């Protein structure tokens, strides 16, 4: 870079000097031609020439330095005038060239000086920064950075606006329960669907569980069979349970569950279609094998035949029936959330939120009606069969299609699909009913309908 700068400086100086010399010489020649007033044609021995002299008489122009000789291509006056014009043009052109060279050199020098000055300033600034880094920063001069935007703003931007402080930490908000679109209000569904029914049944086929026997007599006590199954009192009140547990039907308070000493392996399951329950045939006539759901739904007296319950080795999630779209925990959370909404004035709600609350309220009412209907039917059948005292020796094995074995339903809503329409027929045949009485609430209702 320095070599190029030096070369430019040298060329600029040479160009300016040459143009200046040409300007000076051109001006001198033009001045000399202008000083010669006239030119005469003189015949010399070699030929004719135009002889120009300062004097009016050519004889007096003996000095060659003061005389101008021109070849007569044209008349002498025309040649003299043309030479004069050429010299003046050359002088003006040299002057213009000298000016351009001076301006170009000056601009280049200014640019070089400005660049060097900026470099000097930068070096000074860097030195000052180094000195600043060496000093300890003042805490008062610190400016905190702007916090980044919330990562969850886009997730809640499409969901209905609600005051999240009014909802407890154990309450599931509405968008996570109902996956639908109500008047342009977009809500979300749970990301993890329940496992398929066939996968649960196929996994249960590969396991063998221990046995439990429901004995007769003794005081009223209930031992929980599994974490996935809970009891429901006869009055129809459903206790609060964790989100992982599923609700079952009622168990009488006079039932006692005791572990049996002898254990045996259970036969493999027989898989049927989705619309038909999966039945586990029992090898003993007086002790049919029941699942966790069927055992908790059984309403029997202490003096009936013993019921053997199977307790598996798998986790609690796969022992109970597959979960429905809205499980009991979400159901209770929704009731609590709707109750909190109803505590507020309807004037403060938007029309969309008000209509959403009304829709959920109607759904909850329908579910309560179905649950109350099932509990009422079970209580009614229990009152009918209470006076009956069946003997364990009279129990016999039912056909495979009518045997009340392990019942796995598609959802909790299957309870209200059975109605006690055959109650008079059950009253007309009390002895046969007590001999063939099934061991689950759903089996009782189904047998009554048939």
Curated annotation (Swiss-Prot):
Keyword Amino-acid biosynthesis tagged: no
Signal sequence coordinates: 1-29
Cytoplasmic face residues: 107-450
Cell compartment(s), UniProt: Early endosome membrane; Late endosome membrane; Recycling endosome membrane; Cell membrane
Keywords on record: Cell membrane, Endosome, Isopeptide bond, Membrane, Phosphoprotein, Signal, Transmembrane, Transmembrane helix, Ubl conjugation
Phosphoserine, modified sites: 275
Disordered as annotated region, ranges: 235-284
Cellular component per GO, a single term: plasma membrane
Regions of compositional bias (Polar residues) in chain numbering: 246-256
Swiss-Prot/TrEMBL GO biological process terms: CXCL12-activated CXCR4 signaling pathway; negative adaptation of signaling pathway; receptor internalization
Ranges annotated as spanning the membrane: 86-106
GO molecular function: ubiquitin ligase activator activity
UniProt motif PPxY: location: 148-151, 194-197
Similarity field: Belongs to the ENTREP family.
Protein name: Endosomal transmembrane epsin interactor 1
